[in-house]
Amino acid sequence: AWDAVHGLSESFQYYLLKASNEIAKEKGHCENFGRTKYADGILPIDTYKKDVDEICSEELQHDWESLRASILEHGLRHSTLSAQMPSESSSVVCNATNGIEPPRDYLSVKKSKKGPLKQIVPSYGTLKNNYTLLWEQPNNTGYINIVAVMQKFFDQAISGNWSYNPINYEGSEVPTSVMANDFLTTYKYGWKTSYYQNTHDQKTDEVEPAHPMGWHDNVEDVGIQGKTRLDNLLEELDNSNEEECESCAI
């Protein structure tokens, strides 16, 4: 998984920079470009925390040196280009998951000014066995590594999160040592900032919050009475035509 994230993140940043450089050739670089590290030919691949290579040691696949030379000559039309933010409001519109955050469940029910909205994870019928739900994760290792590998290439800080399910620990209590280790590990692997520390409250609510860390943008949680409706809905999707749109079906 880390290798795939590494390749995608590298291409993401490389082509963002390449496109901005091409625009700069045509229209000139952005105002105050000289105040950026890019103006000195410094790229994210030069400044990332080298401990990340313990997670993934994949070689770079793009010609960064030619791009560096072109940036030094022509500049960039943008001072920054990449960020990884939660996308809750837009995810409702396009039926997507919330950025890189694991979904809390396959089905969420949210309400907006226009009324309750049912949202199923994308391609549930074909990808249901490939989703890792937030509270099914045994620990934060996988998530920490993914954010670290992405941060290697991004030129803005990613705010990551830690999530804990008490049932995974003796006495249903998350040890302080576990949380401290996660904190130190994120620092070691180059996290710039952290955001929320989530703890599963074991409620039987079958929906994920409007934002996995509790922030609401005109979208609030709506409870579902019992589990039967969810089971019936997912069973219906299992038996539906794969070509049908899950969002439209519900």
Predicted segments, located by residue:
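Extended, well-ordered alpha-helical scaffold/bundle regions in very large, multi-domain proteins
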Residues: 1-51
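Acidic, low-complexity intrinsically disordered tails
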Residues: 208-250
